[in-house]
Amino acid sequence: MGNISRRNFLKYAGLTGGVAGLASLAGCSGNGGDGADGDKIKIGVSIWSSTDALGKLSVDIIKKAADILGVEITTVDQGHVSEQVTAPIETLCAAGCNGIVVCNSADSEMTAAINTCNDNQVYLAQFYRMISKENSPDVYSLAENSQYYIGAVHEDEVGNGEKLIELLTADNADAFEGIQKGARNIKLEAWTVGDATFQERWKGYKSGIEKWNAANPSDQATLSDPVYANTSSSEGANVTQQFYNTDNTMDALIVAGGGGDPLVGSVGQLKNMNLTGKIRVASTDFLDDLKDQLATGGMYCESGGHFCDPLYSFLMVYAACKGSETFMPKSGDFGKEIKFPYVFVSSVKEYEDYEKYFVDDAPYTDDEMKDLATKDFDALCTSAESLSIEDVKTRHA
């Protein structure tokens, strides 16, 4: 199989999601290691959506790795609704999958997920999420004492939030003409109440505001309380209109996340209100048309490029299913943690570099993916943490 670009992932992958994903579960067999009777390893993927901008890329790259490694996967969309996050774990385990990767919403959902995997001897890892020891000590302790919870791959969300505030408040001569001046009245659109990742990003936004205000006592910036848009474009549009109707002096909007659809709605609503290129918009999760949005002022800056995060979660589960010693969970040890780096862009020029090395061509060739699957945890962690535009340039020179 040749190397596949992100642009061609979707056509290549033949994705299975939602009801179709559940229908294919009967093909799973064998627990806690290689498939029974010599069958393939089967790994379940529980994700909020396999069709929005980030969700699609996430499932596509797992599918690419699975095909290279001869693994069967089944994808279930759960919409970040708590009962829909936990129920598919039971279904995947009952069908006999060897491992599961999950993007949950709240830490509390991991209690049922871990217990179910413990009972069924199925390996479990998170992606885009990490159980908080501080906020969820009981859930953290449960994971710590599990022999099947492998760990988590996630991002430095506090640092992400701080960096986006730094970009929003700074002047930028390379930005679209109408939004070159730093923002001071920033509105915050969140997605799901209680989402663990949002809570960390919010800490970063608030920290970034505090740092700016401490350094600029005569030029203060403000950040609104969050208003929640869930994961739909229509609710994103409604929240954006609500912000502007309430305070038309706003000069920036952070769409904190939600997979991409809320951002699509917010950007579209600003266009409908003739505010494109007049209000800075920042977000996390790259849109398919980000280059055009940067060029026209629809977007000011964005963090993203982290769609390889679920790839590494998948590789950890795969390694555990294969019996690789450095990935095997041990009771009393919380598990493995990989902290994935973000890519930040705030100009067309910056995005063009990202596009060349992450979009037009995949950041990993087939041979490189095969090599990643042979690494021990420390080496795999190093590979993940070093992923950047410069890293891909070096490897693919």
Where are these regions (language model features)?
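Extracytoplasmic "Venus flytrap"
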Residues: 41-61, 65, 74-86, 103-107, ...
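Flexible loop/hinge segments that line or gate small-molecule binding clefts
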Residues: 114-159, 179, 290-291
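Hydrophobic alpha-helical
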Residues: 100-119, 205, 225-292
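Hydrophobic alpha-helical segments within soluble ligand-binding/sensing domains
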Residues: 85, 145, 150-183, 236-237, ...
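Bacterial lipoprotein signal-peptidase II cleavage site
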Residues: 28-36
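Hinge/cleft segment of the Venus flytrap/periplasmic-binding protein
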Residues: 39, 184, 189-193, 313-397
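N-terminal export signals
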Residues: 2, 8-28
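Short, solvent-exposed amphipathic alpha-helices that sit
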Residues: 54-68, 160-164, 196-216, 265
